[in-house]
């Protein structure tokens, strides 16, 4: 699914090496459940992963495992797209062209348009994921 989302919506990331990990810990930020996050790798992580992929990973995407297990494919795609929106390719940069950017609004303008059929998807998915964690306790 991640490859398909990248190919369809983010062709500029076609050469980026992205490691996807499932996060088994409930993470909060600003009182909200973190469904996914992405980080740019540092030199150490790139070096430690250069035997797995040429020159190491450029990004690591973390997806909440409970969210993934309890959500529909459309919601999974929404989370993946949202995280990919943070990625920026700066071809004029020295060194790696892969950067991170913040939100253009609380979300991204492009995501608002793509999710107009379900504008509160993140709240709904957060509640589903919270319920999955509560069942564990």
Describe each PLM feature range.
Residues 1-18, 22-70, 74, 90-137:
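Metalloprotease/metallohydrolase-associated module, dominated by Zn2+-dependent proteases
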Residues 78-90:
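Active-site recognition of the HExxH zinc-binding catalytic motif
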């Amino acid at each position: 699914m991640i490859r398909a989302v990248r190919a369809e919506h983010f062709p500029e990331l076609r050469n980026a090496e992205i490691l996807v990990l499932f996060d088994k810990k409930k993470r909060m930020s600003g009182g909200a459940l973190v469904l996914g996050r992405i980080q740019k790798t540092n030199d150490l992580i790139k070096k430690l992963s250069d035997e797995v992929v040429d020159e190491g990973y450029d990004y690591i995407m973390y997806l909440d495992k409970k969210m993934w297990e309890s959500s529909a494919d459309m919601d999974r795609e929404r989370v993946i797209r949202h995280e990919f929106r943070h990625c920026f390719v700066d071809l004029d940069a020295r060194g790696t062209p892969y950067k991170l950017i913040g939100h253009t609004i609380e979300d991204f303008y492009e995501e608002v348009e793509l999710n107009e059929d379900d504008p509160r998807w993140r709240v709904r998915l957060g509640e589903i994921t919270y319920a999955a964690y509560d069942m564990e306790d």
